[in-house]
Amino acid sequence: MKIGDIDLGEKPVLLAPMEDVTDASFRIVCKRFGADMVYTEFVPSDGLIRDAAKAIAKMKTSDDEAPIGIQIYGNNPEAMVEAAKMADNADQIAGGHGCDVIDINFGCPVSKIAGRGAGSGMMREPDKMVMITKSIVEAVRKPVTVKTRLGWDEDSKIIVELAERLQDTGIKALTVHGRTRCQMYKGEADWTLIGKIKENPRMHIPIIGNGDINSAQKAKDAFDRFGVDSIMVGRASFGHPWIFHEIKHVLQTGEEAAPMSVNDRVALAKWHLSLSTALKGPVTGILEMRRHLACYFKGLPDFKETRVKLVTAPTAEEVDALLDYISERWGNCPLNETSSVYGL
């Protein structure tokens, strides 16, 4: 599969953009486990054109993450075009690698974004959505992609027709999450309409399916049943970035990968922590790692007290000591028989 000139190989598995999750350290971790392409957190168009430091910082990437997409969102057409131009030149503005793809967020359902007419709020204004997309495609050099949903609600699932219109603007790929905005993340994702987009003989750009890919078998089923060109993994990667390895292993061999041992998880947590503190400093790096540390050891028996200590430890040294303790106490946990299979 290609996005523009970017060859992602056969059946690529992508990391979805997620606010407060897909920062640089997590993106590097997911790449290490086999993600074929990763995306930044959501970058607000109004923040970029105001020269807001936080928005600009979200565009800083590294060669270790490539290929990478910068995802922008907003409702104002002029601001979105200007933000796209800035993303197009992110290497000069924010430093680092820059971006390989500019992705437009027409899918986020949270109220603070959709309620302002951005993200999946744009599903109520498909003409404006198409106009913004076309204007961005014409304004930048990098390939442009779109991520969106089935529609605003159950009565307005417009994605099959809208996919054609978006393709006609010149985008190079389309990602569709199998829920409406009003569903948020409730219930199960419905991939039926994603499959119908692929069945449309007029569609020629890659279609990337998203929604509830929380196991290697579900990933395989998505490719087999709905014929998508690629899948995008979101929430299931949080606390479980090795899901990319698990998916690739099933796709390539037909067999389940060996489980991630406690010792491997400890090694991963230490590496991830070192990345986070190196990129964000010892204070912020530890604070923002806590959400990941809390999830890396799900399923361990009698772990509650240690989890509390893990997410409140104020220094990297104390976190490291707790991780060593986890390895000593739970390293032979029968839920995780194997060790060091991931080469960490």
Predicted regions and their residues:
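Alpha/beta catalytic cores of nucleotide-metabolism and tRNA/nucleoside-modifying enzymes
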Residues: 1-4, 9, 19, 24-25, ...
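Functionally engaged cysteine thiol sites
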Residues: 30, 108, 341
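Methionine-biased hydrophobic packing positions in alpha-helices, especially
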Residues: 18, 80, 106, 122-123, ...
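Alpha/beta enzyme core
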Residues: 81-118, 126-205
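Hydrophobic faces of well-ordered beta-strands that scaffold small-molecule active sites
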Residues: 13-16, 38-40, 68-72, 102-104, ...
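Active-site beta-loop-alpha junctions enriched in small/polar residues
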Residues: 18-20, 43-45, 73-75, 107-109, ...
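Glycine-rich, positively charged N-terminal anion/phosphate-binding segment
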Residues: 1-4, 9, 18-94
